[in-house]
């Protein structure tokens, strides 16, 4: 038996952070299913025992000891003969003597009831959402094992973990590390197969980069490659799965599902590449699928059953309601209308039409009585001052309080509806519309919100919310000018540049890291750019207090955004 007649598998799993028993059960169930198909080696994602990222759970010494126990127990339960590689954290035995971090980010080879080998991650990402140097020591020791096949033949397998494969000097113009673990492996060992355990978060456009990089690695090193990626959402991070296997020519011969668990059988004797067709018709479709997974997993893993959303009749709350209904079912979504004297009639009818299209429940609470109560309570103190944004924000805070009351009373998760454009410049109210336990579209620019809603109406994708209806988002919600409706005849463009201009400036500032001078040079008006840059800086205190936002771009206002609040920067 040789590589071409051996059978491999990828268990693309959705772990729950910290659920060692549940995660081991998922692995065991997957391996038991694969055992019936003659599999010799199963590869799972990075840190599959505890889920990625475990963050400061790794500082809990008992949690780490429990991981060791869980791996031993799992090894004893696995079917005999099948080799399984799982991701785990393991102790650094030299930490006390020589210093350094107490743990390694590791991969454990389990077979015949035992933990046969432990391999350690060499490259520890500490940028954007990654903070592995906080917990882990740089890996040392062998990254190779011999897979003994039933006919007496052996295969030499090299084991890498996520970032280890992201530093090829022949692929990247600029590298983050001096070392290339894959190059060192292939130079020092005669390998038959390379595997990579990964927990690579989703971002728009990232899959093309992954495929190109992994294809390059397979071709350059003349090695078949198995890449096992985590799927599921953990807090702000969404993992898209899309595990792959490449032959030594760089052709993809197995491809995992996106945004769903999957078990892939990998046979290197089965000919050429699998079709390269995408399972999503556009970026809008892909982002929607990512957000649906993000909401579903956040709700379920936080042990909620239902959600509540404020329905304004605007496009942001419409999209969030659609995402929620698709994620957890229409019967588990409550939309609350809270009209004020400034709410237009079409906003109310649009919100109700949306709810009808989605099939979600609604409840209406006019806020005029509460507005009057606040006005009376503050009348003496505010007597010599004219109305301004204070009164506008009070309306938002009344609505936020009502939604939180409903959340508390019924145990529903409140999902806030602010988009990235608004969150960037602070066009949102702290303790008002920012209230919530999850910000579903906080990384989605306003222009993208429009395009996703337009896609929802025209797509033929088999979505639950499309059953029996061609129109998901009422057309008037998409076509009417955006407005917060906090004062008479108010439009967003009274306070902000047009969204196509604003989003381009924000893209250059946040994603391309350009200065105001460079953005102005690209063709935008100086006054507009300088105002937007200032708004982004002074809104930092709001973002610091916002609900966790699902990340779908390469630069989000979440765990990877670390800007000071009290600062003075002129550049």
Predicted regions and their residues:
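Enzyme catalytic cores with a strong preference for nitrogen-chemistry domains
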Residues: 1-310, 323-330, 337, 362
């Amino acid at each position: 038996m040789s590589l071409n007649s051996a059978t491999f598998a990828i268990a693309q799993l959705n772990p729950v952070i910290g659920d060692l028993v549940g995660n081991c059960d998922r692995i065991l169930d997957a391996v038991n299913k694969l055992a019936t198909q003659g599999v010799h080696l199963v590869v799972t994602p990075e840190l599959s025992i505890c889920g990625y990222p475990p963050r400061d759970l790794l500082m809990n010494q008992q949690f780490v000891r429990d991981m060791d126990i869980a791996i031993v127990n799992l090894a004893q339960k696995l079917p005999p003969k099948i080799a399984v590689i799982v991701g785990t954290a393991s102790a650094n035995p030299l930490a006390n003597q020589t210093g350094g971090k107490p743990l390694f980010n590791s991969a454990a080879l389990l077979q015949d009831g035992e933990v046969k080998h432990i391999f350690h991650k060499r490259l520890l990402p500490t940028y954007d959402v990654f903070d592995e140097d906080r917990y882990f020591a740089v890996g040392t020791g062998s990254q190779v094992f011999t897979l003994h096949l039933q006919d007496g033949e052996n295969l030499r397998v090299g084991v890498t973990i996520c970032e280890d494969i992201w530093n090829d000097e022949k692929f990247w113009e600029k590298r983050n590390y001096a070392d290339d673990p894959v190059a060192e492996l292939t130079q020092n060992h005669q390998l038959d197969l390379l595997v990579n355990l990964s927990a690579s978060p989703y971002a728009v456009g990232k899959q093309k980069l992954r495929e190109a990089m992994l294809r390059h690695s397979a071709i350059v090193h003349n090695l078949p490659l198995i890449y096992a990626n985590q799927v599921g959402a953990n807090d702000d991070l969404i993992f898209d799965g899309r595990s792959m296997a490449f032959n030594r020519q760089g052709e993809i011969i197995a491809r995992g599902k996106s945004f769903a668990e999957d078990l892939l059988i990998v046979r290197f004797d089965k000919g050429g590449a699998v079709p390269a067709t995408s399972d999503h018709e556009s970026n809008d479709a892909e982002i929607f699928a990512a957000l649906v997974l993000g909401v579903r997993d956040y709700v379920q893993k936080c042990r909620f059953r239902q959600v509540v959303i404020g329905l304004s009749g605007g496009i942001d709350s419409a999209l969030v309601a659609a995402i929620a209904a698709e994620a957890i079912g229409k019967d588990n979504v409550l939309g609350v209308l809270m009209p004020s004297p400034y709410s237009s009639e079409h906003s109310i009818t649009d919100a109700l039409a949306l709810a009808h299209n989605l099939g979600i429940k609604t409840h209406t609470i006019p806020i005029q009585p509460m507005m009057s109560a606040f006005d009376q309570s503050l009348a003496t103190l505010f007597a010599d001052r004219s109305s301004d944004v204070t009164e506008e924000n009070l309306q938002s805070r009344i609505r936020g309080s009502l939604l939180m009351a409903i959340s508390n009373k019924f145990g529903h998760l409140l999902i806030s509806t602010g988009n990235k454009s608004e969150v960037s410049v602070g066009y949102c109210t702290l303790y008002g519309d920012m209230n919530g336990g999850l910000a579903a579209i906080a990384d989605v620019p306003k222009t993208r919100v429009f395009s996703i809603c337009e896609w929802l109406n025209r797509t033929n994708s088999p979505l639950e919310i499309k059953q029996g209806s061609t129109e998901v988002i009422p057309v008037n919600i998409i076509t009417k000018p955006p407005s917060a409706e906090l004062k008479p005849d108010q439009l967003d463009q009274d306070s902000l540049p047009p969204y196509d201009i604003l989003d381009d400036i924000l893209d250059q500032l946040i994603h391309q890291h350009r200065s105001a001078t460079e953005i102005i040079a690209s063709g935008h008006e100086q006054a507009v750019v300088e105002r937007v840059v200032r708004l982004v800086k002074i809104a930092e205190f709001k973002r610091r207090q916002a609900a966790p936002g699902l990340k779908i771009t390469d630069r989000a206002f979440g765990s990877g955004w670390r800007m000071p609040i009290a600062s003075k920067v002129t550049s």
